Amino acid sequence: MSAQPVDLQIFGRSLRVNCPPEQRDALNQAAEDLNQRLQDLKERTRVTNTEQLVFIAALNISYELTQEKAKTRDYASSMEQRIRMLQQTIEQALLEQGRISERPGSKFE
């Protein structure tokens, strides 16, 4: 589907962006989240310059995204290691039961 214009209010400013209809709810939620972050940041820091607040919020969001990506990579690596260990355990159990023959290239990869 084609993108359609969506009007947003962020930190007292109007913004019109194009967005696919199926992503409209997520966009509105993101705008609400950004609005709340900016308001919280303004109250915590006493910074009144909107541009500075936006940059600080962007840095915070970027940092959070970087942390989440690292967690995802670590989790994926951990799962890959567990899968390999499980695969080796299964192969060893089958070998011990004589169900598969031990020969090069017989690994399940």
Curated annotation (Swiss-Prot):
Gene3D superfamilies: 1.20.5.50, Cell division protein ZapA protomer, N-terminal domain (3.30.160.880). It comes from the Bacteria. Residues 21-99 form a coiled coil. InterPro entries: Cell_div_ZapA-like (IPR007838), Cell_div_ZapA-like_sf (IPR036192), Cell_div_ZapA_eubact (IPR023771), Cell_div_ZapA_N (IPR042233). One of its GO terms (cellular component) is plasma membrane. It holds the Pfam family ZapA. Disulfide bonds: none annotated. Activator of cell division through the inhibition of FtsZ GTPase activity, therefore promoting FtsZ assembly into bundles of protofilaments necessary for the formation of the division Z ring. It is recruited early at mid-cell but it is not essential for cell division. Belongs to the ZapA family. Type 1 subfamily. Homodimer. Interacts with FtsZ. HAMAP family: ZapA_type1 (MF_02012). This is Cell division protein ZapA. It comes from Klebsiella pneumoniae (strain 342).
